[in-house]
Amino acid sequence: MKPTTIFLMGPTASGKTDLAIQLRSSLPVEVISVDSALIYKGMDIGTAKPSKEELALAPHRLIDILDPSESYSAMNFRDDALREMADITAQGKIPLLVGGTMLYYKALIEGLSPLPSADENIRAELEQKAAQQGWAALHTELAKIDPMSAARINPSDSQRINRALEVFYITGKSLTELTEEKGEALPYDFVQFAIAPQDRHVLHERIEQRFHKMIELGFQEEVEKLYTRGDLNINLPSIRCVGYRQMWEYLQGDYDHEEMIFRGICATRQLAKRQLTWLRGWKTPIQWLDSLQPQQAKETVLRHLDSYQKG
């Protein structure tokens, strides 16, 4: 019999952390973060990282594990999450995976086909080509080889364009083809919940309020520390995180403070929309919870898990 794990998914600002803390007080669970922004050290305010008080109530694994100069893939996450899940189940507890990075959940459930390691010669050739023609030209080349990846990748995102082309030149297969080849399935039975307000306008309001609160808490100062380090740039995954990108561009002088706030809120709302789109198209059953009914949401999880474990 496979061990059980719980997935608590949902868009940004939906109340996942609060519910996770409530669940930990009632269930033998340990929390694993499923968030591609919370992995970075020194990025606390703009990622809405759980506070010290919240982490004391519900410690989260896989947060603060990387410097913002480093990259992290879905495959890295899968390896790390499986290790942490094994450790938790060995203690007789249930892994509770909490977060909104849907690609990480997908990688965990379905597995990933191994992608080739970086080839420095090919990367150098692509860099040289980009220096002559521009990354937009390489993005056009990618669109002919792998239209699905090209549609997901911004024409100015040099790192991801380079990687997608590199994979094709090494393997002769597109990144889309390779990622669709299934890897090893998840060795757990999983129960899935998604929390969100039933009214989309409530989520939009929460996102706007939270962004303004981040500004009050010192978000600009947090990004200024990263900006003045000198070794970070806007093409890094960390700085491309929602909110950080807009604040970075503001610090560069690309637009004024008011425009930065407007763009940051819009980008966060777009992220939430993408997360909800993922969830609505999810292939395996999800139990939906209402953010505005936290006690009812907790009781639903407890009841659902109890009936699931009884078979």
From Swiss-Prot:
Pfam families cross-referenced by the UniProt entry: IPPT
**How would you classify this enzyme at the top EC level?**
transferase
Q: Tell me which EC number(s) this protein carries.
A: 2.5.1.75
- Cite the entry's keywords alphabetically: ATP-binding, Magnesium, Nucleotide-binding, Transferase, tRNA processing
Keyword Transcription in annotation: no
Which cofactors must be present for this protein to function?
Mg(2+)
Q: Where is this site: Interaction with substrate tRNA?
A: T101, R123
Q: Which reaction does it catalyse?
A: adenosine(37) in tRNA + dimethylallyl diphosphate = N(6)-dimethylallyladenosine(37) in tRNA + diphosphate
GO terms, molecular function: ATP binding; tRNA dimethylallyltransferase activity
The keyword Transferase is annotated on this UniProt entry: yes
Gene3D superfamilies reported for this sequence:
1.10.20.140, P-loop containing nucleotide triphosphate hydrolases
Which spans of this chain does the record mark as coiled coil? none
| Binding locations of ATP | G10, P11, T12, A13, S14, G15, K16, T17
Gene Ontology terms: biological process: tRNA modification
Could you say which residues bind substrate here? T12, A13, S14, G15, K16, T17
Entry's InterPro entries? Dimethylallyltransferase (IPR039657), IPT (IPR018022), P-loop_NTPase (IPR027417)
Ranges for the region named Interaction with substrate tRNA are 35-38, 159-163, 240-245
Record family assignment:
Belongs to the IPP transferase family.
Q: What does this protein do?
A: Catalyzes the transfer of a dimethylallyl group onto the adenine at position 37 in tRNAs that read codons beginning with uridine, leading to the formation of N6-(dimethylallyl)adenosine (i(6)A).
Q: How does it assemble?
A: Monomer.
Which NCBIfam families does this UniProt record tie to the protein? miaA
Can you say what this protein is called? tRNA dimethylallyltransferase
Q: What is the lineage of its organism?
A: Bacteria, Pseudomonadati, Pseudomonadota, Gammaproteobacteria, Pasteurellales
